[in-house]
């Protein structure tokens, strides 16, 4: 009972702190750097990480196995993984973290919702999960999901900012064209100079935006590369585990199939990044597609309850 109380306490404290941290992140995006907010932000992140870590440790001690046996535990570990990945761009550019931070509160909030009430009770592992490969395979896959989701979010942000820039530039050019059709030459020259001056000012104002686009592209590539490495290790370790448990390295189980699709999507992303002739928007589109594919891979099998991996979403009741 005391373990469950501490687990419940750590869960809700971490969720509350993450909510405050994201609010501070959003404030720092609008307002210039404030020392007090930066200090609170750093302390909040450390405290959140400590609470989630304490929750996982308590769950591990109480259950007697690494807490990755069901969907609830994997969501908590995914939230913890989000925090780890979130810290990588934090030390370089704190504003990038405001894009990836909501992933932590989303998974944390979803895990603490009433949907997983029964799963919060630790249960006996099914025979297939009673293996040393549980920690290796599942932890690598969850870390991969966290890294790939964070990198994909950065790519989505890149597309949004780029799209806004294109609309603004198109509006300036269209205005100049319309003016040239309805005014005389002298007025046209004056209007052109005004518009060009405005465009120059517009470029100066949005110089930060272009810098942010470059940073988003660079960090999304780095984080996705890290996630791709974790995903490859997770798939390989899962194949070895499958051979020990079921006598075959690969069975084209729905989970395995979607994991392969995910791996292929991000392999295409990395291949596009090696081509210097292609714009960053091309790879960002692929990463955005990968964002949806990951959620299908992660939740699809568990919620539908199909395939050999579906046991992770159900409770084993002892008789």
Curated annotation (Swiss-Prot):
PANTHER family: CYTOCHROME B_B6 PROTEIN-RELATED, HEME EXPORTER PROTEIN C. It comes from Fagopyrum esculentum subsp. ancestrale (Wild buckwheat). HAMAP family: CytC_CcsA. InterPro entries: Cyt_c_assembly, Cyt_c_biogenesis_CcsA, Cyt_c_biogenesis_CcsA/CcmC. GO terms for molecular function: heme binding. GO terms for biological process: cytochrome complex assembly. May interact with Ccs1. It is found in: Plastid, Chloroplast thylakoid membrane. Belongs to the CcmF/CycK/Ccl1/NrfE/CcsA family. Keywords: Chloroplast, Cytochrome c-type biogenesis, Membrane, Plastid, Thylakoid, Transmembrane, Transmembrane helix. Its main location: plastid. This is Cytochrome c biogenesis protein CcsA. GO terms for cellular component: chloroplast thylakoid membrane; plasma membrane. It holds the Pfam family Cytochrom_C_asm. It is a multi-pass membrane protein. Required during biogenesis of c-type cytochromes (cytochrome c6 and cytochrome f) at the step of heme attachment. The chain crosses the membrane at residues 15-35, 44-64, 71-91, 96-116, 141-161, 223-243, 258-278, 284-304.
